[in-house]
């Protein structure tokens, strides 16, 4: 069933399914693909089964839905599901997928409630103001508690849940849901079928009172978010289903409420109403409206693009994937205009022209080649050579740069040593391909040892990348022990440090004099590091304008190798105060060398310190082991931030240096007889205590 791709944009939904790693996201997505498949295959379950089997092979390889965007159809609406990874090491992937979504469904584990990773993803969704609804899953499991999960959404996510459904029955007796908008019951009876059919019934008598109470709460919450509802509610008038649905949609799109539904995807209960809600309450590309980018020449000049085919083409490359049969596929969200196979576009970030090869729409288990695609759609494209994740593609005559994405710097690195000469060559290809796909994966070579060093967001992140090198690129390599990616910065201001570079060898010499000041670069609002900053204070042409960028470049190059132990320096403000030049002997190179050396000398006097990555760690443990766990965290130089009771267990939140967390999995297991679990994510950089810093510096210097 190839549907004409020029779908009415009102009927398109670009959604993400976001969740903690075990909340049942893949199962939910799989069931969505299964039911949406049924609507066109009229119950040919063997095809549905084929889709499912195909998904399971993918899961064996540990990937959640092969495709970065899967298109399916529900009640003549096109739903593009954009996958978001659930593990904290892949925050870059989450950021990137949120950037191209219009709305999201957050899946919660009905037993565990709101988990740390859910909070991280939720915060990222707040940053991009993504309208979202919630699906409380796994209500058939022992210990599942829908109402506690809703309370946690308020406490931990600071959200305004709008409960649209209540569970009927609990744990193994979970039968279905009460629909509070239509005031009816939806039940899925009998385990034998795949849950395609459900009954619409009267609300069971024993739930009538609870349903009335929650219907009242629904109206109260809606009236606070919507003036029209408020007026009618205060006058005591009744609402039609259509009026309520329109109000829920308005409040959801304004990000004032988050509709909450429930069910169990694994037992096939509650998925169709979830799809209905996606269509009814989440935004279409038209609701999101125009996207604002900036001009190629001037970052401060705003350029807008409306989601219409008549506008000039603009799109964002948000994911690169390697397809075993097709090679490199780049996923693009088209924001405006049309994208046609065979056309030429320009990469607005690097200025290169790109020819669009084939354009594919990705379905659950097949890809469909299409000739062209309009605004608001998400497709995969072949044939692009110089485009990376986060780049903008646009009409050559009307260029625009869409907001680029910022990714955190890697915090952990390992040395990787290919076993043979042929592995060396394959490693180069693998690294190139993987760093194209993943901007948080970086590579450098150690100048002293000549080793290749790869860096990423956590141990799991690097393990998966090394595993992919082995499997996809057949690279056999030995991998060193993980090392922490330290940084350096300064704590004191040094004013008017002078350095003169001169060299006289036959012919023209080199001459440059610079006077610089260094100081810590701090953001006054957050009191955290504000990155590198260069200020030019030179007046009266004492350093010609064309040489000033060279001083800046020299200082930045000096920052790549800090003065303490050669780690990259961060958060330094450099001010060029004065200088001198020579008509014949001065050059860009001379000023670059002067800037570089002046920076190094001044940095040594500016009280340089070592910084280390701190991780926010959350440990869940039975109370009997509480003292042991806290003692262990303290011994790792951790700072306990909070502890609370949750479902009979104790949950400890702490900030711990990454260098002290290696091997924590095994230690925690043995100290708590395997009964405790933990999760961790990067938080910030903090100063290393003097005694430990001295040891690290000695080790690096080989003393």
Curated annotation (Swiss-Prot):
Residues 10-286 form the tr-type G domain. It holds the Pfam family GTP_EFTU. GTP binds at residues 19-26, 83-87, 137-140. GO terms for cellular component: cytoplasm. It comes from the Bacteria. PROSITE patterns: G_TR_1, G_TR_2. The keyword Transport does not apply. PANTHER family: RIBOSOME-RELEASING FACTOR 2, MITOCHONDRIAL, TRANSLATION ELONGATION FACTOR G-RELATED. Belongs to the TRAFAC class translation factor GTPase superfamily. Classic translation factor GTPase family. EF-G/EF-2 subfamily. This is Elongation factor G. The lineage of its organism: Bacteria, Bacillati, Actinomycetota, Actinomycetes, Propionibacteriales.
